[in-house]
């Protein structure tokens, strides 16, 4: 596993309701076979923590040593079955997801076919993809970044909430500028917040957003707060989406049976393709659409595209739109083509990503506590 890091210029000042984003951290899984063919995966959990990832990669590498790299589902069951006592829904699943993606990329490169063919072939000719950033507390930066996304071909943009009492003016500014041109997703980012808002805060925000045109409201509560999700649906007709930090179909089961989400979001670089398909199939049975969560590098982006093209109930996939140079080094073709909010099937072998070991020197990782989740409880939102 290689950890890459890029420090954002201070002028960007990326922040949201639960913390600040000072760095782009990319934990890359590189899987190599006996013939020196390689595949790439990514581990979303590695953005937040370093040491456990290293140990878990070593653990699963020993477990899979001398295994046939083409037996991908068997490898998943072997990893999960051997770790179930301590890894039912934890960080280990996230490491498994990164390995799973790397195995598919490796097989695609060896067979000289795109990953979507290994996943059963396309269900649709194109997939909607949205630009995901909006980590701003002022309309000027928000609108400039959204315009950057629009000029590339995006027609849906996601913004993060910083202050629930101030976000409506930003939403209003966006809708005025991009009316009939680009739609907006609002992410409350409470799913993994250290100090989440009171239930009333999220309900009041949803009521205010009713007057604005948005695609969906994402994670207005901590992911385990099923009652909050039930309550908010009594007060709003907005589409409510979640819960990206849940890694398995088994964990999503209660959310579907309790009907607390309108749109399911699983993280592609946590669940991987094997478990991601189970989540989508379960959602399909419950007539629920899926919006793939992909808050990572080009590896996660391409994984979301390949997967989304092959699954009937995937409505969106996500493109992490923070401004950094790492993606240019990982995209095989430097960028993906986006037109009128959609992207089509990639013309590539594997995922369409590449890796040079020298990237570790170009983007060196510095071990430290990540600031993406702040634990300060000095200002708890009550209304």
Regions found by a protein language model. Name each.
Residues 1, 83, 109, 113-125, ...:
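N-terminal amphipathic alpha-helix/helix-capping segment at the start of soluble metabolic enzymes
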Residues 1-40, 44-45, 322-329, 379-383:
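Structured beta-strand/loop patches that form or line metal/cofactor-binding pockets in enzymes
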Residues 29, 36, 99, 112, ...:
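Conserved, mostly hydrophobic/aromatic
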Residues 32-110, 382-383:
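Metal- or metallocofactor-binding catalytic centers and their adjacent structured scaffolds
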Residues 43, 131-134, 159-161, 186-190, ...:
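A cross-domain feature marking catalytic cores of carbohydrate-active enzymes
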Residues 120, 125-236:
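Metal-dependent enolase-superfamily TIM-barrel catalytic cores that perform enediolate-based chemistry
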Residues 213, 224-241, 246-342, 346-350:
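Shared catalytic-loop signature of beta/alpha-barrel
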Residues 351-383:
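Extended hydrophobic packing segments that form well-structured cores
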